[in-house]
């Protein structure tokens, strides 16, 4: 069994004034406020959300 890669995602900018789909991507990743961090699986679905709102986030491999 292989272990799945993990990504640490931190919200660095606010979602105030952003379009609804970008707010939904941030919420879908489990982020709630600036400097909030979550660890998510490195899947194509999560990568897609991260790429869409990359200007709001900081991403590190765990």
Swiss-Prot record:
Database matches in InterPro entries: Ribo_uL30_ferredoxin-like_sf, Ribosomal_uL30_bac-type, Ribosomal_uL30_ferredoxin-like
Disulfide bond annotation, renumbered to this chain: none
GO cellular component: cytosolic large ribosomal subunit
Biological processes, Gene Ontology terms: translation
NCBIfam families for the chain: rpmD_bact (TIGR01308)
Family listed: Belongs to the universal ribosomal protein uL30 family.
Name of protein: Large ribosomal subunit protein uL30
Organism of derivation: Alkalilimnicola ehrlichii (strain ATCC BAA-1101 / DSM 17681 / MLHE-1)
Gene (name only): rpmD
């Amino acid at each position: 069994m292989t272990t799945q890669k993990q990504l640490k995602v931190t919200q660095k900018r606010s979602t105030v004034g952003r379009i609804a789909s970008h707010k939904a991507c941030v919420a879908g990743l489990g982020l709630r406020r600036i400097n909030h961090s979550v660890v998510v699986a490195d899947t194509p679905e999560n990568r897609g959300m991260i790429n869409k709102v990359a200007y709001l986030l900081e991403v590190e491999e765990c």
